Amino acid sequence: MLRVDQTGTILIKNGTVVNDDRYFKSDVLVENGIIKEISKNIEPKEGIKVVDATDKLLLPGGIDTHTHFQLPFMGTVSVDDFDIGTQAAVAGGTTFIIDFVIPTRGQSLLEAYDQWKKWADEKVNCDYSLHVAITWWSEQVSREMEILVKERGVNSFKCFMAYKNSFMVTDQEMYHIFKRCKELGAIAQVHAENGDMVFEGQKKMLEMGITGPEGHELSRPEALEAEATNRAIVIADSVCTPVYIVHVQSIGAADVICKHRKEGVRVYGEPIAAGLGVDGSHMWNHDWRHAAAFVMGPPIRPDPRTKGVLMDYLARGDLDCVGTDNCTFCADQKAMGKDDFTKIPNGVNGVEDRMSIVWENGVNTGKLTWCQFVRATSSEAARIFNIYPRKGRIDVGCDGDIVIWDPNQSKTISKDTHHHAVDFNIFEGIKVTGIAVTTIVAGNIVWSDNKLSCVKGSGRFVPRPPFGPVFDGIEQRDKVRNELLRKVDRKPYEDDNTKNSSK
Ligand code: URP
Ligand code: ZN
Ligand code: ZN
């Protein structure tokens, strides 16, 4: 569904192309949605749209690995739907999102997938893909995972270790899900928090009379995230399959990931904009509405060092790509938990501000180079989820998803100017220098001069093939480790009587 003026053809002049391995000054020509030429002094053909990018950077469109648009969750539905959510995305320089299909316990994965895809196809303003959560385990689930991988373009499945009595799976179920992921060449993803302990912690807080939003963090401290992260990695490594920890929110969890990586375990970690941009002390704010707006799981940590340390991990490459977990609820929805924090719908914004928050806290602090920024916000996600270099790179033949980034232009983030449906912004008042001035999706300008010009439903579903680069070398690692598992040859057991009688 394209507008007539959407030709997918554009010439960008005089910009600095930044990929994750190098940057250079060049013009870029996109034709019919695909990058056609990258060279200096491309002459514009007659009638072609030309944009000047002098003193600006040309970045591969951002990839948000983790959104929940119009998610039915905790008795309500997140307010950023696939239309508003992808509008907010492109306004911030993100041109590709991966959302999560979350079937209910007992529901067919295929049925849920079809439902999510319909919701998205009708509304998306940029390309997208779907992860699928596995919330129960059976032969049927196993068969449907295969269909999703082989016929529906899914190469990632998420397990929840939290949300007891709804999405949470047991360790044994997780073991079987991971084994199936390995057979199918799909990456296993995990929401890592010890759900049983969270459940007990919640009861304890309520018994103590702590009913406000601070009870959310107090009932699910860092240690429960670190413990579950460790457990997920150990289980995945026991079946020798790559595992991706979504929304790494604490120093303890990041340390665990780093320790296992040092030992050669194939684990990936995803920090999110919230954890890199703010701290969780807001949950102690005296204004209930303000405090509740920061409630998400795992909690944004109150330890003020956290965001800087997570950024250090990202810069070192010990955390991989930045998502958002964008899952927004307005004040009246959050108020479902006004007397009991366990009923506050979990989730915050991020999809619009992710790129600027990472630039501000990463590039402007001297922690990330331009190339590392591109890696963290786009290329690495494309590699892990096996759509690179179609996405995540500016090169001939790649999709024409390009952001014209002004590293010197500033803005102050606010709910009054953001493009979300939600009535709160967790980054309110933060000044960022480094913003997307123009966003191009498939060769069409969708954001420029502070104005959106998207076409609802014009985004495409991008299938992701299995056995991506995260599986490279996995077979050999498994083989070598299995060779160490040796049976000991022994004579058959004889009890003492048999032994004596044979003497
Ligand atoms: O609080 C969160 N994270 N809400 C969305 C669901 C999830 O756990 O990712
Ligand atoms: Zn989660
Ligand atoms: Zn999530």
UniProtKB/Swiss-Prot annotation:
Extract the InterPro entries matched here: Amidohydro-rel, Hydantoinase/dihydroPyrase, Metal-dep_hydrolase_composite, Metal_Hydrolase, Metallo-dep_Hydrolases_sf
Describe cofactor binding as the record notes it.
Binds 2 Zn(2+) ions per subunit.
- Consult the record and explain the modifications the protein receives after translation: Carboxylation allows a single lysine to coordinate two zinc ions.
Q: What name goes with this protein? A: Dihydropyrimidinase
- Per the similarity annotation, which family is this? Belongs to the metallo-dependent hydrolases superfamily. Hydantoinase/dihydropyrimidinase family.
Q: In this chain, where does the modification N6-carboxylysine occur?
A: 158
List positions binding Zn(2+) 1: 66, 68, 158, 325
Q: What does this protein do?
A: Catalyzes the second step of the reductive pyrimidine degradation, the reversible hydrolytic ring opening of dihydropyrimidines. Can catalyze the ring opening of 5,6-dihydrouracil to N-carbamyl-alanine and of 5,6-dihydrothymine to N-carbamyl-amino isobutyrate.
Q: Which GO terms describe its biological process?
A: pyrimidine nucleobase catabolic process
Which UniProt keywords are given for this protein, alphabetically ordered? Hydrolase, Metal-binding, Zinc
Which residues hold substrate? 163, 346
